């Protein structure tokens, strides 16, 4: 017995302790529930309204204070506003904490109300209440509500997910436990609250592990209802759009009955008014990726009206392990086209790589044949030589089926592993003996392929350049150039040519490597499928097609070239975020799943989410049998077919879980040969999913499914199937993750139903080959395991679980490394998106500009004071800030840097305010006249502003400009400049960060940590980007002046929403067009069919056509 087991015996395990602490709270809920049952329907709803009013009344004073401060801040000087905004931020935090304390206090009563509402719907076909305005609105859109006179009639049946359901569910006690956990409760706090003590805590997140069939969806209604009462927004996150739509319709009436609004973002187009309204609902359902993409789209919006999301308040994630662990490695990306087109390289070099792979296959097959011959001899030296050839064959083509079969013979695998250990000694010092004879070397565990000199020779062929695919040593080549007796200009020319050659060769080598990976590591119908002439990735966890997802770094193009389908264009990232960092933005985060305990460490390390295991409502009586091990995959599949036939004859439904489309189709063909009727559910047939799952619990039904993880629909047994022994689960191999195996097992034995599960495995399975080889091989040899035999032992199960732990640890390392890289980007993203949001909304834009001016002044002072360069300072101040130095050269040399910064900053602020006042004074009379004469005709107007180099035609709302005494013009101009500058700088920065991420990986060859280099270099890139952007923005704003002097204001078309229809949209890719475009004055600007909200033009010359559209020359019109 290990130490943790000893502790558990004395103190109970963690989940038991958590549940013991929650139990008194559950008892209090049940006590209130017994009294709530006696209330009338109207009294029940009335109590909910009273609690919602209480939540708003308690924070009324704070909200009024915020309104007062927002009025005050407009009257303050720009530099004095920061203190007030900080005070507003603190009050908003106080509001959230105050509401949270109230929610904790009323939680028992609210849970009792929800439970009793569920009971009333379950026990009554209709529920009659006094109609409210909300009821009348519902009756217009939903069939389950009708209005008769002053009464609203709620029915207990409605449509959800395309099927009519009759409500028949009432919360079990275990679901109350789950609801408490999902509300993000610290159980100890509740005991203190119940006893009347004050208790404050920092809000944490919790995950409720609830077994399949235990009603996670119903349990979530408790915390969702409670938190929605604040009207701050609750997001219920699912893994696919079918579940989000179904659950919103299924649980919606429970919430709507009490006046809470419910919507689903997946029912509406991105960036539409309907989707915006969905986010304004009290409860919003949606898929994880759509929530993430809406966040990215909001941070590409050009008008406040384009924003759809509110603040990230509280989210409950269904199948949380699938979202936060399985999907966490894939970032969400919005991207656009790049100028570079290297797609043809994949087609150009495809035939060379195909030839190389075929040559290697022939070589490794011959090596295997020769190895078998030598190893059959009794001579020890010949045997040793045979092992060397066997290991070489393995390094060249580890997935060779003949090799895999031979390695399953007694003693062979163990002998090869010892040979591998010998050549790996002293950091692979002797490995060249094995690899030099190959054309390339495959590392299946790390998914890498490395070319050898022989491989390069084959690829080069008859090329004139023997080093066509060899990267030169730049350091050595640069040194050789420096030593040549030529001019400095000739040296520079040679260096440029060398760099161009290096870049071209890098691209070629990269293309070859990606093609080799595509041919050797990624198999069709396993990692991907080809549908409609497109390569589509299959999710290894769920078996679903990952619509729109593409492998990065050119790998997807390589697979497309391999499969001879159209190669889609490469893209450049415009906006990106990982699901890890998106969901960490929520103030409160909770999750539910049937399998979280094995990943509890990762949930805590990355998300600070604590896992609590909720007991089942009824004891699980499923029979989980020991794994059955076979020598070869052929024997295993034959045994599976026999097992299916036996179970079917007993009248039991059978669910066969496979890990790939290929295996599901293989088993399907084998069953067809035996004339066994069955259903197949895999990535190619996902449209029939709901129908197939609904039939899977009928007696004698056979269902083959690719990884049932996250299917979201319970398999309900017929009476005959239950009597026959329940659902039988057959796993065709162990998955890399224990969670996926547990999810498959969990499909059987729901709510106390009978059932069984067993996994069939072979020595040829990927998991066994790569991670369980040595221990299993020893076990096989000791037992004298022969072909055709089956092994069942607890020791085998333990060995397999240890192998799975190895894989899980490796995958966790990958995810954590990804997060460490993205954390660098995340801190930068937060700065940029916060500044962009301030510019878009406009409330804090003035404060941000003041801070930017200070940063620019500080940067200029530091740059020139270090060298006592007064002339340089003078030139830069005029160029960037449009001011003369407020100090003499003598003062510049003697003044401290901090004092100098303050003096120049104060002068810049004075000039900035004066410039803005000049614009207002010039334009105000024209605005007054326009408002009187055409105010009822024009809605938007254009007031061009120029910085002397470009014209910014910004559209303004005429009434708003008039009401603000033309100061709205200043704010809108600032907003236009800021948004365009931020977007341009951020896109370029993302491109540079992508390039940096790729380049720093080479640091590992120099025994340096790529992440450390990435952090240092990315900080410098970000600092330079901010400095450049600040100078560009401030330079434009400091020089801004009204362009029209003798012309009245013109009408503009209304501001348009960001048109996402122009973008190329995929699940993780989106193409965006530019927002502000410069136009030369020589182009015809007389006819403007559409006036965009923001547009930039170069300065118009005297003899150019006037931009006002009069047809006259500029000098005779508006000059």
Curated annotation (Swiss-Prot):
Keyword Cell inner membrane among record annotations: yes
Job description of the protein: Part of the Sec protein translocase complex. Interacts with the SecYEG preprotein conducting channel. Has a central role in coupling the hydrolysis of ATP to the transfer of proteins into and across the cell membrane, serving as an ATP-driven molecular motor driving the stepwise translocation of polypeptide chains across the membrane.
NCBIfam families recorded: PRK12901.1
Subcellular location: Cell inner membrane; Cytoplasm
Binding site for Zn(2+): 1106, 1108, 1117-1118
Residues annotated for ATP binding in this entry: 175, 213-217, 714
GO CC entries: cell envelope Sec protein transport complex; cytosol; plasma membrane
GO process annotations (BP): intracellular protein transmembrane transport; protein import; protein targeting; protein transport by the Sec complex
Cofactor(s) listed in the protein's UniProt record: Zn(2+)
Textual note on the cofactor: May bind 1 zinc ion per subunit.
E.C. no: 7.4.2.8
UniProt keyword annotations, A-Z: ATP-binding, Cell inner membrane, Cell membrane, Cytoplasm, Membrane, Metal-binding, Nucleotide-binding, Protein transport, Translocase, Translocation, Transport, Zinc
Family of this protein: Belongs to the SecA family.
Record's protein name: Protein translocase subunit SecA
InterPro entries the UniProt entry points to: Helicase_ATP-bd, Helicase_C-like, P-loop_NTPase, SEC_C_motif, SecA, SecA_CS, SecA_DEAD, SecA_motor_DEAD
